[in-house]
Amino acid sequence: MSELKSRIGNSGSIANSGPVSILCYCASSILMTVTNKFVVNTDGFNMFFVMLFAQSLVCTMCLMVLKMFGYAKYRPLNLIDVKNWLPISFLLVFMIFTSAKALKYMPVPIYTIFKNLTIILIAYGEVLFFGGSVTPMELSSFILMVLSSVVASLGDQQAAKIAQPLANNSILSPEYYWMFLNCICSASFVLIMRKRIKLTNFKDYDTMFYNNALALPILLGFSFLSEDWSSENLAQNFSGESLSAMIISGMTSVGISYCSGWCVRATSSTTYSMVGALNKLPIALAGLIFFDAPRNFLSIMSIFIGFASGLSYAVAKQKKVQKN
């Protein structure tokens, strides 16, 4: 079983603290989004699966080092747990890959707004798989989420038309397909992981180790099948700048990998998605600061509508818990 080596008397309470897990998840989410955007925007970079392989490899190696020094314990790979967790690893790969493809073409603020749609899928998924209901206030927040996504796409198209008047900018553009696929994969990942954690009784380090260790052969296989491994393309993708960016990206993935599982375990999958909604405003602002994202009225308005929807959803969930 997974446990952090106890050096502080209240380490157990911290490990099970919902607020602490939420704060750590927010910080790692912001860092991961900004870092991944930097990596995929590196000139000539096109080996997404290799980037994801590097991230999973760094996570796995960090865990092995922690275990070597006695700071972490996790279950060794075994056939039963591998069979139970393999679908999660495939979903994780698809989730991060579609996220990287969407980030390649989408500004960070627009990307974060569309991620709100995942909350709707997760909420109704929880109704379907775990019972419960959706309150009128939750439904109102969902309408705001959809509205923010529509406004964001209009702002994105407006900015694109100014930059490239003859370009075909519509909701049917490839980046929106990648974004919608990412929402489906993300919701499936969170819902199924919650069920599998209960089934396997995994702890945080178990979840982190299995997520990344099982993803390694999957990512490498997809890379060999779909990416260009010619010497010219390798030289283009493994320049000094892209290598440094991938290493940094791998280091940030350690935090998001651990904090995602921690937050789902310490709270719930809906709370996890709700926190992600409230986290959209700082992520979107970070995108405006660090990248050349559209800065027009519609784009800015969509950010605040998205934040309002997340806030509304948070209040709705709190009232629902108090009522029950």
From Swiss-Prot:
Membrane-topology descriptor: Multi-pass membrane protein
SUPFAM superfamilies noted in UniProt: Multidrug resistance efflux transporter EmrE
Keywords: Cytoplasmic vesicle, Endoplasmic reticulum, Glycoprotein, Golgi apparatus, Membrane, Sugar transport, Transmembrane, Transmembrane helix, Transport
InterPro entries reported in the protein's UniProt record: TPT_transporter
Lumenal side of membrane: 35-44, 98-116, 160-170, 226-243, 292-295
One function term, GO molecular function aspect: nucleotide-sugar transmembrane transporter activity
Annotated localization: Golgi apparatus membrane; Cytoplasmic vesicle membrane; Endoplasmic reticulum membrane
Cytoplasmic compartment residues: 1-13, 66-76, 138, 192-204, 265-270, 317-324
GO cellular component, one term: endoplasmic reticulum membrane
One Gene Ontology biological process: protein N-linked glycosylation
Glycosylated sites: N116, N168, N237
Biological function: Involved in the import of GDP-mannose from the cytoplasm into the Golgi lumen.
Family, similarity comment: Belongs to the TPT transporter family. SLC35D subfamily.
Description of how the protein assembles with itself and partners: Homooligomer.
Protein name: GDP-mannose transporter
Organism: Candida glabrata (strain ATCC 2001 / BCRC 20586 / JCM 3761 / NBRC 0622 / NRRL Y-65 / CBS 138) (Yeast)
Name of encoding gene: VRG4
